[in-house]
Structure formats: structure tokens, C-alpha cells
A protein has these predicted regions:
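Metabolite-binding pocket within alpha/beta catalytic cores that recognizes anionic/polar moieties
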Residues: 1-129
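Glycine-rich beta-alpha junction loops
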Residues: 10, 91, 109, 153, ...
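Conserved active-site and cofactor/substrate-binding residues in soluble primary-metabolism enzymes
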Residues: 12, 63-70, 79, 175-178, ...
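Short, well-ordered secondary-structure micro-motifs
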Residues: 17, 96-97, 116, 159-162, ...
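Short, well-ordered amphipathic alpha-helical segments that serve as non-catalytic structural scaffolds
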Residues: 71-75, 131-135, 218-229
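Active-site rim beta-loop-alpha module in soluble metabolic enzymes
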Residues: 118-174, 178-187
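Active-site-adjacent mobile loop/cap segments within catalytic or ligand-binding domains
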Residues: 164-169, 173, 178-216
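His/Asp/Glu-rich mid-to-C-terminal helical/loop segments that flank catalytic regions of hydrolases
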Residues: 201-238
Length: 238
């Protein structure tokens, strides 16, 4: 496995990775499109990182599935990676044993929790069930958890979303993994999602408040795991 590409939504999540791996910005890599690309040779590998970019009107990071699809497609078509790592923050549940700052690796498949198409065939297509690599060989080495990543287009969650998560087994709730997984599946490129928990859905506290309060801690934990995946050559065991 020579080429690894990180797909990261937010610049705040990406900056420690850029510093650690000595990644250099590739100016104008995608023309006028928002995603930004970085590259370096590190530990006998080519490391790439693509962020969703900044929306000009607000100055904020692009988030969500649409931005993630664009970033993932541009990354794959430009760099042809051997492995995609979708690194970011996510929510989870106290009832499932999660705590703030826990890091999860995707397991089994990646799904969507807010796509409801009750027509045979399209129902499963909408939910996704997109492939990801089996992380069980490395979980014990880096003291992380594993779970099914599930994506939606909102930071909060509805009762219908929760019901679909029960049906699919989704647990680690974010806004990008499903989109990246879809692109990876089209190109038949192995995918690993690495998600650090910023908020607990059933903790009784506001999701935006939890996200803002815990983003720094979660990002530190996230990046530490991503460092180890490369530095300790754990990606070669996937």
C-alpha cells in the first residue's frame, strides 16, 4: 500500500495531520473548485489529504455529503490512492457505551440514516450498506473502538433517523462518511473511516453545544490515531 489519501471535511481537523506528515499545499490542484489538496512523501508512502474547502460567503468549511462527494471524487481521479481514510468527528450514544473523545474505526459497512425510499430495491440503495475495510486486525493495537458509521445531512437527529439507525445497525453518526464510501465503492478503493466523538445524542445536552465544547479534544484524539495508522504501518495490516 503505497498511496494513502485522507479525506477530511474541516480545516481544523486537517491542520495537525498537515503538520505531522509535512504535507504541502498543491496550489490550484482542482482549479476554481473549493476542495484543497496536500501531498508529501512520508514513511515510504505517498500521503495525500483533501479538505472540502471554504465557502466564500461565510468563510466556513463546507460540510455534508455533497461537499464530501466532490472532495472524494477529485481525490480519487487526481491521485488514484490505494486506501482512502475518511477522518473526522462524529456523534454517538451513551446507551451504546460511547464517551466524548472516543475514537471509532468503521466496521462492516457504511450507511445513511436520513434516506427513506420505501420502494423495493431503492430502499436498500438509499440506506447504502457501502463497503469498508475490516479493522479488527489493528483495533487492539491502538486502543480504539469500532462501529457502523451512519451519515445524514443534519447535525441533529429525528425520531425517523433513530428508527432507521436501529434497522441498519448504524451508530457513529456523521455528515460525510456515507458520501466518501459511495465514491470509494464506485472506484473499488478500500475505505477506512476514523471518527472521534464530539457529542452524545442521548446525553440530554444540546448537540451544537457539545460539538463546540468537545471539538478540540476529539480532534486531538482523532489525529493521534491517524498518526499511528501511518507511523506504525498499521494501514498495511488492513
Amino acid at each position: 500500500m503505497k498511496k494513502v489519501c485522507f479525506i477530511v471535511a474541516m480545516q481544523g481537523e486537517a491542520k495537525p495531520l498537515i503538520r505531522h506528515f509535512g504535507l504541502h499545499h498543491i496550489e490550484g490542484c482542482f482549479g476554481s473548485l473549493p476542495p484543497q489538496a496536500y501531498r508529501a512523501s512520508y514513511a515510504e508512502k505517498e500521503i495525500f489529504l483533501v479538505t472540502n474547502g471554504i465557502e466564500q460567503e461565510t468563510g466556513l468549511d463546507y460540510i455534508g455529503c455533497e461537499a464530501a462527494v466532490l472532495s472524494a471524487h477529485l481525490a480519487v481521479s487526481s491521485f488514484s490512492p490505494d486506501l482512502i481514510i475518511n477522518a473526522g468527528t462524529a456523534g454517538d450514544f451513551v446507551s451504546k457505551g460511547a464517551e466524548i473523545g472516543d475514537v471509532y474505526l468503521s466496521n462492516k459497512y457504511v450507511v445513511f440514516h436520513d434516506r427513506r425510499v420505501p420502494i423495493p430495491g431503492w430502499d436498500k440503495m438509499g440506506q447504502g450498506y457501502l463497503p469498508c475495510v475490516d479493522p479488527l486486525n489493528i483495533i487492539s493495537e491502538i486502543n480504539v473502538k469500532s462501529g457502523v458509521c451512519t451519515s445524514g445531512s443534519s447535525l441533529d437527529i429525528t425520531g425517523d433517523d433513530l428508527e432507521q439507525m436501529k434497522q441498519t445497525g448504524g451508530e457513529v453518526k456523521d455528515m460525510e462518511a456515507g458520501a466518501v464510501a459511495w465514491v470509494a465503492s464506485l472506484y473499488n478503493i478500500p475505505l477506512l473511516c476514523v471518527k472521534a466523538i464530539t457529542d452524545l445524542v442521548d446525553a440530554g445536552h444540546s448537540t451544537p453545544e457539545q460539538f463546540n465544547d468537545n471539538f478540540l479534544l476529539a480532534t486531538q484524539r482523532l489525529d493521534d490515531v491517524c498518526f499511528r495508522l501511518i507511523d506504525e504501518k498499521l494501514v498495511d495490516k488492513l
